[in-house]
Amino acid sequence: MIAKQKIKILIGVIIVIATYHFIVSSNVRSKDLSDLVDLGSSDKSTTENERPKNNIVTNNRLDNPPNEDIPHAEPDSPPQEPPKSGNKPDFSIFFEGLEKFAIKQPGIKDKYTSEKAKEKFSTDDNFLFGKEYLENVLDIPQATFKELKDSHKRYVDEHIPKMLQRVKTFGSLAPSDKEWESYKGSSGYIIVGGGRFTWLSFLVIKQLRATGAKLPVEMFIATESDYEKEFCEKVLPKYNARCNVFDYKLADDLKKRFDIGGYQYKMLALLSSKFENVLYLDSDNFPTRNVDYLFESDLYKENNLLLWPDAWARTTNPKYYEIAGVPVKENKLRYSKYDEKQAGGKDKLKPLSEYTFKDSWYHDFEGTLPDPTSETGMFMVNKSSHLKTLLLCLYYNVFGPQYYYPLLTQGSAGEGDKETFIAAAHVMKEPWYQCARQFKWTGYVSKVDNKFTSKALAHYDPVQAQDTTRQDVDIIFMHLSYPKFYPNWLADNHDLVYADTDEHIRMYSSINKNVGYDFDLRVMQFFTEGLCPNYYDSKTGKPIENIPHIDYTNDYMGNHLMYVKDEEQNNIDRCNKVFIPHLKWLKETAEIPTVVS
C-alpha cells in the first residue's frame, strides 16, 4: 500500500516537473530559438518540431544530427560574401593577378642608344627603316628582353585561356545575366570625359546629334572628383547620352597598383561600356556625318575591328615580335615608296623575292604589322568577338608606358596606346581592317608666312575607301587636334583671328564641299552657345541672334560644368573680343547653307 502511494507521488512529481519544463520551454525567447535553428541549419530547412530528438547543444555548436548533411562552413566562421549584384558591375576580375606579369627590370622608355626613332611619313622615300636601324634605337638589356618575353608568353598561353573560361565578353556581363539579351548586339559611342575633357566631349556629342546620329552615347568618368551631377543627370539625357561612372574604389586601386591613367582610361571605358559594339571617339574628334551606318556595314561585321591610319611610318622594334612570339620571315610582301625611288621608278622594281632585310623597310615583310601606323582617335570593336584581342590589349596598356609603348613606337610620333589594338589583334590572329585611305591634312595657307598651317586631320569613310581608285570618298571624322577647342587656347594663340590685322580665319574651309556645310560655323556655334553667358539676353535668356531651341538656362554650360563656370569672367572678355564677333563673321561669309541648331 505504501509502495503504491510512493509510486503515485513520484508520478505526480514527474508530471509537475514536466509541466513546469513545458511552460518554461514555451517562453524561450524567439531570438534564442532562431539562434539554435541557425546553428544547425543545412541547405534543407528544418522546423523545430522536425528536428531529431537527440540533438544537443554543446559550446554553441550543434552536433551533427543523424541523416543531415554537414554545413559547408562552420557556424562560427565569417559569413560568405554574397554574389555581386547585377546592378553593381564587378570589373576587378580583369585585373586579378596581373602583378604576376609585371616586369621587374627598369623601364625602357627614353632609353635610346643615341636618339629616338625618326619621325617620317609612311610615304617617305629617303630613309631606310630597315631591321638593323629599328632594332638599335632602344637600348634593351638582355635581362629586360628575357623578362618581357617570359611575361608575354605566360600571359598569352596561361592567363588568357583561363580568362576565356571565366568571361565571354570584355565586360562584367555573362550570358546567364538577364541584361545579356539587351547587351548582345547592342551598339553605341563612347567618349572619355572629366574636367576640361567633359567640355570637349560635350561639343562632340552636340555635333554627333547634329549629323542625325541616333545611337546612344556613354561619357566615361574615371574619378569621383570629375563627376558633375547636374550635367550627368540633366544635360546628357537630352542627347540620349549618359555618364558611365567607373567604380571609384577600383579606379583608386588600379592607380595604386599600376598607376592607371591617361591613355589607359580608354581601356577602362571599353571595359565598363554597356555596349557590345563600340565606336570610340577621342574628346576632340568630331564626326562630320551620321556614322551610325558603320555598325551595320559588311566591312565591320566581317572584321569586328575597324581602325583608321595615322600618317607615320611604323617604327616598331623588331624585338617586339620576338617578345610576342610572332615569327617574321624574310619574305617581302609589298613595295614602299623607298623601293620605288631606289629602283628609279615603279617599272624598274625588282621582284619581291629578291629583297632582304638589309635593303628594304622591315615592316614590308611577312609577319610584321604594315605601314602606316594607326590613329586610335576613333576605332570600332566588338567586345565579344575580339575578347582575346582586348585582353592582350589590356596587358599592353597596363604595362604600356614603360615597356610596350616604347617597343611599338620607339619615341616616334604619337607614342602611346595607338598601336596596342592592331598589335594585339595581330598576335591573337583575330581579324582587323584599317581604312585604305590615309587622312587629309586640313588647314589653310597662313597670311603671316604664306605657308600651309595644318589644324585638323580629316578621316575618310572606310567602306567607300575600299575602292582605292575612287576620288570622292566622304570625310566622316575631323580630329581637331590642334587647336583643341579650349577657350584660352583659341584666344591666346590667335587661331581664329590674326594678331596683327584682326582678320578672321576659317580653319577648315577645305572640307566644306565634301561634307556639305560650313564645318567651322557649325562647331563655332556650339562652342559659343555653350561657353559665352553674354551670348544670351540678360532679361529673356534667349540668344542675341535669332537661333531657335536654345536658351541660357539649358545651353550655357557655365550652369552645369565647373570648367566653364570657373573661367566665366575671363570667358566673357574672350567672347566679347573674339568668339561672338568670329561667329558673326562666319555667318556673314558662309558660302554653304548651314544648319546650326
UniProtKB/Swiss-Prot annotation:
Its cofactor is Mn(2+). Pathway: Protein modification; protein glycosylation. InterPro entries: Alpha_mannosyltransferase, Nucleotide-diphossugar_trans. The chain crosses the membrane at residues 7-27. Residues 28-597 are extracellular. Coiled coil: none annotated. One of its GO terms (cellular component) is Golgi apparatus. Glycans are attached at N382. Its EC number is 2.4.1.-. Residues 1-6 are cytoplasmic. Alpha-1,2-mannosyltransferase required for cell wall integrity. Responsible for addition of the first alpha-1,2-linked mannose to form the branches on the mannan backbone of oligosaccharides. Addition of alpha-1,2-mannose is required for stabilization of the alpha-1,6-mannose backbone and hence regulates mannan fibril length; and is important for both immune recognition and virulence. Promotes iron uptake and usage along the endocytosis pathway under iron-limiting conditions. This is Alpha-1,2-mannosyltransferase MNN2.
